[in-house]
A protein has these predicted regions:
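Acidic interaction surfaces
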Residues: 1-125
Length: 125
């Protein structure tokens, strides 16, 4: 099933494009919050009315239109979705995705080097 994502922010970092976006969350807040600690009825009312946003966060690391890495975090509950950009939530996912993206760049660099070598050899014969 395809999910539609709403972009929260995008920016350049270390030669990559970082895209932070969100989509609706499949799981119920009841699976993440305890009735003894939270007023679940009020929470559901706040989500339904739009006072709270219940979503899954995604971070993608791109070069041009190529996705090198992505990380996801479900069960996000915020009054203002943009708070994920300043409270460390998105930064944690960005850091994880950047590590993966840098590994992927190195892997692809080596692969393209091998392909280039093969093509150079073919042209020399």
């Amino acid at each position: 099933m395809t999910k539609n994502y709403e972009e929260i922010d995008s920016f350049e970092r270390a030669g990559f494009t970082v895209i932070v976006d969100k989509t609706w969350e499949d799981i119920s807040p009841r699976d993440c919050f305890d009735d003894e600690c939270w007023d679940m009825k009020q929470m559901f009312e706040d989500i339904e009315s739009g006072r709270l946003d219940w979503f899954m966060l995604r971070v993608r690391i791109m070069v041009d239109e190529y996705e090198l890495a992505s990380e996801y975090l479900g069960g996000c509950l915020y009054e203002n979705v943009r708070d994920v950009l300043t409270d460390g939530t998105a930064e944690d996912l960005i850091a994880q995705a950047m590590v993966t993206a840098k590994r992927e760049v190195y892997r692809m660099y080596k692969k393209f080097q091998d392909i280039s070598w093969e093509h150079d050899c073919e042209g020399a014969v």
